[in-house]
């Protein structure tokens, strides 16, 4: 068979073999040679032997280049520069990567950018992410089954590091410390790796004021790519390029979980209120990255070992009444009125910041209040279990649905404000959160800036959701007038009741309330700062 015919026959097969790896690290690069050379530029179609088609260079897909890292200063929260493998990601592991041309993408440029498909990545595609509760019975079943399949299917391309860079070659110096991991567990592991503490050495307390995916501008961009990666992995697993992750609209204001049924994310167990019903497949799931004390004291990294079951007890935290109810429906449109993406210090105490508001450290109007947990944070805490612990939260599959809705809010904000990136800081954000920082631990490197775009036009997906538009001036005036009239009516009615009650009391010579009755104002008077939320 002549070479051109061989290429024609073999290419479709190879296209299926080389699926995208968008994280740490492609299996082909987890070798002594690659680690020592610092090069991770796998072949796409090596007709003439290994190394003959790095990044698909022979067909113009891409080329091997030096990794570009962000060297701008980060914020003051992190004080241990030089001690963490995630600094200037991914330079501690690799300094050369594939840079793909046009719509090509992936660790060897063998796949397509989000929103494109086909052998030459020339066919546009748009995935629709829908409300989980709007899915048919069959669609719900398929989604639940797909999640479970991802939980038990080894990722075809990715392996995870189980040691820090200084120990990556193993005890004998010749055994790379990487492990296989399932598709869904990789999703869990990525999140853990981004939030883990910085190990400072045996006998020293690990540094905890570091988080590459929360409490800063990258919160929305990091989680956007995190979801995009899982969605792509599941599309490949299912061989269905139209598969889209659904969302959970958690802004119901209720004290019940409307997706916690056995046909969806699992009802409450009849035998233990903190466990999932045995009628749900999710009751069989086991949690990854539980041994946080060992990681922090020994300097080890979470591996593929699973532990105990998922814990979940929605609205069950009686010690914190504020987290016993989900965000109110009006919280979302109120959040969308915050027109500045982020504000100094670009941290969890920023005020008038859309990012800090949707993340849930500010109240829905954008005002920072240390006593408040709203929107995304409140939804996590409401779950009251695995889903409420940052390093473990993706183990509960509700995480996926919670974050697709959060991403939908982010995408609507981008649409309303024309993706105004001017207030996304180039520098002085918490480490990992600068605009041009490569998000940890994704591979090939992808910056926060690349995810700060409207999804339908740039990332190939959209949300089936209707948002309430901003109120017009006439509507606001009308609401204000009606509210004022109602208040006046209430005041007159209350005054009439007081007069009538006083008259009756005088006539009967008997007080309405005894001295032992607790007045509503008693607790309020004891609050030092009444303007703060009372929990």
UniProtKB/Swiss-Prot annotation:
GO terms for molecular function: metal ion binding; monooxygenase activity. GO terms for cellular component: melanosome; melanosome membrane. Residues 1-23 form the signal peptide. Zn(2+) B binds at residues 376, 380, 403. It catalyses: 2 5,6-dihydroxyindole-2-carboxylate + O2 = 2 indole-5,6-quinone-2-carboxylate + 2 H2O. Residues 24-478 are lumenal, melanosome. It is found in: Melanosome membrane. Keywords: Copper, Disulfide bond, Glycoprotein, Melanin biosynthesis, Membrane, Metal-binding, Monooxygenase, Oxidoreductase, Signal, Transmembrane, Transmembrane helix, Zinc. Residues 500-535 are cytoplasmic. Zn(2+) A binds at residues 191, 214, 223. Its EC number is 1.14.18.-. InterPro entries: Di-copper_centre_dom_sf, Tyrosinase/Hemocyanin, Tyrosinase_Cu-bd. Pfam families: Tyrosinase (PF00264). Belongs to the tyrosinase family. This is 5,6-dihydroxyindole-2-carboxylic acid oxidase. It comes from Gallus gallus (Chicken).
């Amino acid at each position: 068979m002549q070479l051109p015919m061989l290429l024609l026959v073999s290419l479709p097969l190879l296209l299926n073999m080389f699926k995208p790896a968008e994280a740490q690290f492609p299996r082909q690069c987890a070798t002594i040679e690659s680690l020592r050379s610092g090069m991770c530029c796998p072949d796409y179609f090596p007709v003439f032997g290994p190394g003959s088609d790095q990044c698909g260079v022979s067909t113009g897909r891409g080329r091997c280049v030096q990794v570009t890292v962000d060297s701008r200063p980060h914020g003051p929260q992190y004080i241990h520069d030089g001690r963490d493998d995630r600094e200037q990601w991914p330079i501690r592991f690799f300094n050369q990567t594939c840079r793909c041309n046009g719509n090509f993408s992936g660790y060897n440029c063998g796949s397509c950018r989000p929103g494109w498909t086909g052998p030459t990545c020339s066919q546009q595609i748009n995935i629709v992410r829908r409300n989980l509760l709007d899915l048919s019975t069959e669609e719900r079943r398929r989604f639940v089954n797909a999640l479970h399949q991802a939980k038990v299917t080894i990722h075809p391309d990715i392996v995870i590091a189980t040691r820090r860079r200084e120990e990556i070659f193993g005890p004998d110096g010749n055994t790379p410390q990487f492990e296989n991991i399932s598709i869904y567990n990789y999703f869990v592991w990525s999140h853990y790796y981004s939030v883990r503490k910085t190990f400072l050495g045996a006998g020293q307390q690990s540094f905890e004021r570091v988080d590459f995916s929360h409490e800063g501008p990258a919160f929305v961009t990091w989680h956007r790519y995190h979801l995009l990666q899982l969605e792509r992995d599941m599309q490949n697993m299912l061989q269905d390029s139209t598969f889209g992750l659904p969302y959970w609209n958690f802004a119901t204001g209720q004290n019940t979980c409307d997706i916690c049924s056995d046909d969806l994310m699992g009802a409450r167990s009849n035998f233990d209120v903190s466990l999932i019903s045995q009628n749900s497949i999710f009751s069989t799931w086991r949690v990854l990255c539980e041994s946080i004390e060992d990681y922090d004291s020994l300097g080890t990294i979470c591996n593929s070992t699973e532990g105990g079951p998922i814990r979940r007890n929605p609205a069950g935290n009686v010690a914190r009444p504020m987290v016993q109810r989900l965000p109110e429906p009006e919280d979302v449109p109120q959040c969308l009125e915050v027109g500045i993406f982020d504000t100094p210090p670009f941290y969890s105490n920023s005020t008038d910041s859309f990012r800090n508001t949707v993340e849930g450290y500010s109240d829905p109007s954008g005002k920072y209040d240390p006593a408040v947990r709203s929107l995304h944070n409140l939804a996590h805490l409401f779950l009251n279990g695995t889903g409420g612990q940052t390093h473990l939260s993706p183990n509960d599959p509700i995480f996926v649905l919670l974050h697709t809705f959060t991403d939908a809010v982010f995408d609507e904000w981008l649409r309303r404000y024309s993706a105004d990136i001017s207030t996304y800081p180039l520098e002085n954000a918490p480490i990992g959160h600068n605009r041009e920082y490569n998000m940890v631990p994704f591979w090939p490197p992808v910056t926060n800036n690349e995810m700060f775009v409207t999804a339908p036009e740039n990332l190939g997906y959209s949300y089936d959701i209707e948002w309430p538009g901003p109120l017009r001036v006439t509507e606001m005036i009308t609401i204000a007038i009606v509210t004022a009239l109602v208040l006046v009516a209430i005041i007159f009615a209350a005054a009439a009741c007081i007069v009538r009650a006083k008259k009756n009391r005088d006539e009967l010579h008997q007080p309405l309330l005894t001295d032992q009755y607790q007045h509503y104002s008693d607790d309020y008077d004891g609050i030092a700062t009444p303007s703060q939320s009372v929990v």
